Amino acid sequence: MAQLLMVTVTFGCISLLYLLPGTLSGSLGKGLRPREPPAKIPSSGPQPGHPSLRPVVWKPPHALQPQGRGNPALATVHLPQGGGSRHPGPQRHVGSRRPHAQLLRVGCVLGTCQVQNLSHRLWQLVRPSGRRDSAPVDPSSPHSYG
């Protein structure tokens, strides 16, 4: 029985890994496609009508520190030269508009959705079927639905 379960789980894992995008098993003999287009090399000067851009400092939203403690250089937003800003001077991070942001579902981070989906699918395949995984019904118990 244990060998049958092991074979089933192994086959399920291999099947799910084969279906994942980006695995080499489905693209043998084909050229690998880059995930991002290559960066364009700018010409020897700024294009007419395109202001030259200053570097943009980006920090993930979950890594921002409370107001007043962070590095002001990281909180500064750099805009295109040429008067594209509504307010003169550096702009500060005002803080989160949602006071309970930790209660919100944040979604996928670094591809963990695929891991969660695979884990859930494996659990569905391996879990005991029927009512064996639920509590037994006891009609005399006040906590039972029976």
Swiss-Prot record:
GO MF term (any one): hormone activity
Disulfide bonds, paired cysteine numbers: 108-113
Main location: secreted
Endpoints of the signal sequence: 1-25
Modified-residue entries (Tyrosine amide), positions: 145
Site (described: Required for CALCRL receptor interaction): 105, 112, 117
Expressing tissues: Expression was restricted to the intermediate and anterior lobes of the pituitary.
Prosequence residues removed at maturation: 26-96
InterPro entries noted in UniProt: Adrenomedullin-reg_peptide
Chain residue ranges for the region called Disordered: 29-99
Subcellular location: Secreted
The UniProt record lists the keyword Signal: yes
Key words of the record: Amidation, Cleavage on pair of basic residues, Disulfide bond, Hormone, Secreted, Signal
Cellular component, GO annotation: extracellular space
GO BP, one annotated term: positive regulation of angiogenesis
Function: Intermedin/ADM2 is a peptide hormone that plays a role as physiological regulator of gastrointestinal and cardiovascular bioactivities mediated by the CALCRL-RAMPs receptor complexes. Activates the cAMP-dependent pathway through interaction with CALCRL-RAMP3 receptor complex.
Family, per entry: Belongs to the adrenomedullin family.
Protein name (database record): Protein ADM2
Annotated organism of origin: Rattus norvegicus (Rat)
Gene it is expressed from: Adm2
